[in-house]
């Protein structure tokens, strides 16, 4: 379900402050965030965020194509190892 247009995009308040501090300092450092639910805004383009996936922070470099998506989309929480191989088929 899509968020109402009149509400605008959701971004945690502390996130805007962190992004402004890094941009003002001029250093290209990873901004650690836990807010996977926040929307990526145009002012985040060019910055690198460490998005928490429940285990560690995954570095996500924000590009133009990511604007409007959520941070959680770019840091998977589950590791897929594939389906188990068929042992009977290998013996033949």
UniProtKB/Swiss-Prot annotation:
InterPro entries: Ribosomal_uS19, Ribosomal_uS19_bac-type, Ribosomal_uS19_CS, Ribosomal_uS19_SF
Entry keyword set: Ribonucleoprotein, Ribosomal protein, RNA-binding, rRNA-binding
A Pfam family annotated for this UniProt entry: Ribosomal_S19
Disulfides per UniProt: none
GO biological process, one term: ribosomal small subunit assembly
GO-annotated cellular components: cytoplasm; small ribosomal subunit
GO MF: rRNA binding; structural constituent of ribosome
Role: Protein S19 forms a complex with S13 that binds strongly to the 16S ribosomal RNA.
HAMAP family: Ribosomal_uS19 (MF_00531)
Family, per entry: Belongs to the universal ribosomal protein uS19 family.
Protein name: Small ribosomal subunit protein uS19
Species of the source: Bartonella tribocorum (strain CIP 105476 / IBS 506)
Species lineage: Bacteria, Pseudomonadati, Pseudomonadota, Alphaproteobacteria, Hyphomicrobiales
Gene that this sequence comes from: rpsS
């Amino acid at each position: 379900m899509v968020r109402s247009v009149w509400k605008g995009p959701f971004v945690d308040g502390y996130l805007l402050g962190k992004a402004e501090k890094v941009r003002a300092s001029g250093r290209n450092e990873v901004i650690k965030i836990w807010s996977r639910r926040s929307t990526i805004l145009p002012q985040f383009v060019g910055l690198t965020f460490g998005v928490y996936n429940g285990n560690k922070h995954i570095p996500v470099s924000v590009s133009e194509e990511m604007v409007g998506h959520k941070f959680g989309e770019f840091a998977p929480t589950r590791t897929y190892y594939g389906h188990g191989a068929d042992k009977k088929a290998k013996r033949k």
